Amino acid sequence: MLTVKDTYNQIGVQFSASRGYIWPDLRPFLAAVAPSSTVLDVGCGNGRLLLGLPEQIEYTGLDFSTSLLKKAFENHPQVHFIEADITEPDAWTDLPQFEYIFCIAVIHHLANRREQLFLLKQIKKHLQPDGRYLLTAWNLWQPKILKHHLSPQSLNLKYKMKNLKYLAIPFQKHLRFHFAHTKPYLEGLLREAGFENFKIEKTSRNYLIHN
């Protein structure tokens, strides 16, 4: 199976076409963003969060997919996008602190605790003291996804027998790696990364992590 980066570079055009709207779970959080705020969108993809944000914000989007960022630049030519791997320190070195940080449907693509913790620590570091954040992880234990845990593709994943949270889910003909988080696992990650007073809401499709 391809790496997550290579997968998204292959499916970028088709995937972007399927991500042209704001999920209902996200709308209340985006509606709360004040005009003129500074916003960091971690794993921004094609920049779709901008569809639900005020126009008068200072927005920065990070993503490692050249294909998805091409669509982002096409859709939002005046916006600041950066091509970078968010699991690498260089992606964060020159970034300031932000009033709002969003990280939507990203952390479930990170394969190990080290990368997951690094991402969370960087989000905490780059959030202003009174800032607001929202991260989401797919709820990969929902009924329609359960079949993928024992699919031939998932069972062929390296280390599957060592970590039953690993699974492969197809997008069209391409497989994407996923890490199936649970609420207790996420709570442990957040505490280890230094977060306090956080909330984790479980919906039918997502875990919503916010303050």
Set out the residue ranges of the language-model regions.
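A conserved beta-strand element that flanks and buttresses the S-adenosyl-L-methionine
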Residues: 102
